[in-house]
From Swiss-Prot:
Family: Belongs to the UreD family.
Annotated organism of origin: Brucella anthropi (strain ATCC 49188 / DSM 6882 / CCUG 24695 / JCM 21032 / LMG 3331 / NBRC 15819 / NCTC 12168 / Alc 37) (Ochrobactrum anthropi)
Primary role: Required for maturation of urease via the functional incorporation of the urease nickel metallocenter.
Protein name, UniProt field: Urease accessory protein UreD 2
Keywords from the UniProt entry: Chaperone, Cytoplasm, Nickel insertion
Transmembrane segments: none
Top-level taxon: Bacteria
Location, primary (coarse class): cytoplasm
Record note on quaternary structure: UreD, UreF and UreG form a complex that acts as a GTP-hydrolysis-dependent molecular chaperone, activating the urease apoprotein by helping to assemble the nickel containing metallocenter of UreC. The UreE protein probably delivers the nickel.
Pfam families the UniProt entry points to: UreD (PF01774)
Gene encoding the protein: ureD2
Database matches in PANTHER family: UREASE ACCESSORY PROTEIN D
Length: 274
């Protein structure tokens, strides 16, 4: 019998009079949301997803669902890291589903996820786009706690990202790692680097966006950061040893994609500055 939390958060955004409004919110358990902020001229809603316990333990389940109606624009982030704690019990799960209507834009930019040694974590993101809807999101994962010299020696982590447009898959990736997995130290895989990050952009862009991203991150990051394009999906990756570096590089790439793809300047959520 499960002894963990089962928390749910359901949000619905609609475009109304040049502003995106949070029209519905429903939560069960320790998941909540703050009132939206509106720091941008286009009326995009900046929303902070809150999980007051701060961590996820064995058997906990977090289900987040966000729906953006036609023309709605939202930036979703979190005030702090999500932590998956060591547990002798069952798997801890966080699933996020995002539906974006035609003409809508969703930016899903949570702070990092820290998977403690001995944790059993499953992290899944599923995105459904309609028509010309745009998605820009990242997943930044720390395997263990390198700042505390803690490596990921035991436990398990699963990550899965799926993106669909008009019901057809346009992006899919997943990995599953055990603490003793040889891939963690293999030169062809994770190279003993604890910070693994992926950013996916599904929206209008051309090759000039890739060039601009590479220019923004600079040559110093070329062994840690990569960017590639498959049809209308741009993917950035980081594999390295410093969380601050991963965040800095991804924010630079995000700024470029905002300008070249969305046609508007970067407007970082205020919570990132605290």
């Amino acid at each position: 019998m499960s002894t963990g939390w089962h928390a749910e958060l359901e949000l619905r955004f609609e475009h109304n009079r040049e502003v995106t409004r949070l029209m519905r919110r429903r939560h069960v358990g320790p998941l909540a949301v703050q009132q939206p902020f509106y720091p941008e001229k286009d009326g995009s809603a900046h929303v902070y997803l809150l999980h007051p316990p701060g961590g996820v333990a064995g058997d906990d389940v977090l289900d987040i669902s966000c729906f953006l109606g036609r023309g709605a624009r939202a930036v979703l982030t979190t005030p702090g890291a999500t932590k998956f704690y060591r547990s002798e019990r069952g798997q801890s799960t966080q699933t996020t589903r995002i539906d974006v209507g035609e003409g809508g834009i969703c930016e899903y930019l949570p702070q990092e996820t820290i998977v403690f040694d001995g944790a059993k974590a499953s992290i899944g993101t599923k995105v459904f786009l309609s028509g010309d809807a745009v998605y820009l999101g990242w997943d930044i994962i720390s395997l263990g706690r390198p700042a505390c010299q803690e490596s990921f020696d035991t436990g398990e982590v699963r990550q899965r990202i799926e993106i669909f447009r008009d019901g057809k898959p346009i992006w899919f990736e997943q990995f599953r790692l055990h603490g003793a997995d040889p891939a963690l130290n293999a030169a062809f895989a994770f190279c003993a680097k604890p910070i693994v990050a992926t950013m996916v952009y599904a929206g209008p862009a051309d090759e000039s966006a890739l060039h601009a991203i590479r220019e923004a991150v600079g040559d110093a990051a070329r062994n840690l950061f990569s960017v590639s394009r498959l049809e209308r999906v741009i993917v950035c990756r980081y594999l390295g040893g410093r969380m601050s570096e991963a965040k800095t590089l991804f924010r630079k790439a995000w700024e470029v994609l905002r300008e070249t793809g969305l046609g508007k300047p970067a407007a970082a959520p205020r919570i990132w500055a605290t």
